[in-house]
Design a protein with these regions (language model features):
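Hydrophobic transmembrane alpha-helical segments in integral membrane proteins
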Residues: 4-32, 143-150
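Juxtamembrane loop-transmembrane helix junctions in multi-pass integral membrane proteins
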Residues: 8, 12-22, 46-53, 78-85, ...
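Physicochemical signature of membrane-embedded alpha-helices that form the seven-helix bundle of GPCRs
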Residues: 20-30, 57-61, 83-90, 149-152, ...
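Hydrophobic alpha-helical transmembrane segments of multi-pass membrane proteins
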Residues: 31, 54-75, 181-186
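Internal transmembrane alpha-helix with an interfacial aromatic "cap," most often the third helix
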Residues: 35-45, 70-82, 86-118
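Alpha-helical transmembrane segments in multipass membrane proteins, preferentially the mid-helix core
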Residues: 36-40, 100-104, 129-141, 153-185
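Membrane-interfacial loop-to-transmembrane alpha-helix junctions, especially the N-terminal start
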Residues: 46-62, 110-123, 171-182
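Membrane-interface helix caps and helix-loop-helix hairpins in membrane proteins
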Residues: 74-82, 133-148
Length: 186
């Protein structure tokens, strides 16, 4: 699938209830269950470090976003692209939380929380960019452009923050190699 490309949607009609993209509904629901499970596992340890706290926030936000995404995909026939807005918001927040988690693991080199400030500024900028895009006449013609800033933000947030900081942290904590491998697998 190409980012920004709109394909014909698979449609299921259940006694008058139209469900679109059932494959996305199922995969989003599975991601939500897995994320809720991981968030539950992190819940008791979330106060032990900023790193774990922000991973907990990431999985919790990602889980809620996946549930909303499941509904946004499935009920697209009724809500249109506006039904995906809550998921887009959660994607921006999830990316911010994953960046903050990685920044917290690198705190000894993060003087004056400059990386945290950059992540926050980037999050606000992406929110404003998405609002600008979805308010434009171009969005009315092609609603998929609204997701483009979110996709770019996620790529930057995950690939740069997780891979770069994991690579730097491998020297002191071997477990970061799994995060680095995970980024390359994606």
């Amino acid at each position: 699938m190409l980012i920004g490309e709109d394909f014909t949607k698979i449609r299921i009609d259940l006694n008058g209830l139209v469900i679109l993209e059932p494959n996305a509904v199922i995969s989003d629901f599975i991601m939500a269950l897995a994320s809720f499970y991981i968030a539950k596992k992190l819940y008791s340890t979330r106060r032990s470090s900023g790193f774990l706290k922000y991973w907990y926030y990431f999985f919790l936000t990602f889980a809620f976003g996946s549930i909303l995404g499941s509904m946004g995909h499935g009920l697209f026939h009724y809500f249109g692209p506006q039904g995906k807005f809550p998921t887009w918001i959660s994607a921006i927040l999830s990316t911010y939380f994953i960046e903050k988690a990685m920044i917290k693991s690198y705190e000894q080199y993060n003087k004056n929380n400059i990386l945290g400030k950059i992540a926050f500024f980037k999050m606000i900028t992406v929110f404003l960019l998405v609002i600008t895009v979805i308010s434009s006449p171009a969005f009315d013609k092609n609603h998929t452009i609204g997701f483009l800033p979110i996709a770019i933000n996620t790529l930057i947030g995950v690939f740069i923050s997780v891979s770069v900081i994991s690579a730097a942290n491998i020297k002191t904590q071997v477990g970061f190699k799994w995060l680095l491998i995970g980024v390359f697998v994606m």
